[in-house]
Amino acid sequence: MDTKTLAESYFTAVNKGGWEEFVAENFNYGMCDSQEIRQGRDVYLQGAGQFYALNQHLEVKKLLVEGREVAALNRYRLQSPQGNQLELDVAEFLKFDESDKLIASTIYFDTHRFQEFMQGK
């Protein structure tokens, strides 16, 4: 499958379910709040899973593809456990391997705004 179609399919699965099927066992995960690269599928499934559980809808605003790498600007409509809602723009950088599995993801977003949202402010 071509990389653009893979990325679109992954983001569709974030909305509809099944995104976990895209993730390789050998996975690198980076976040904007740390320079540490977390490794392993389970780490990503836990971290992304907590975030995606808040997702009401993901809209891909811009998608750039080069080889097996993707840069995406996405808008997430989130709902907190307390019922608060937030639209959050997230820059996501993905990498797929030759077997069409997602092997790396690094995300950037306004962590302060997200923390306030989660605290009900």
Map each language-model feature to its residues:
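Short, cysteine-centered beta-strand-loop-beta hairpins and adjacent loop/turn segments enriched
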Residues: 53, 78-87
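A short hydrophobic beta-strand element
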Residues: 67-76, 88
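A short, polar/proline- and glycine-enriched secondary-structure boundary/capping micro-motif
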Residues: 83-85, 113-119
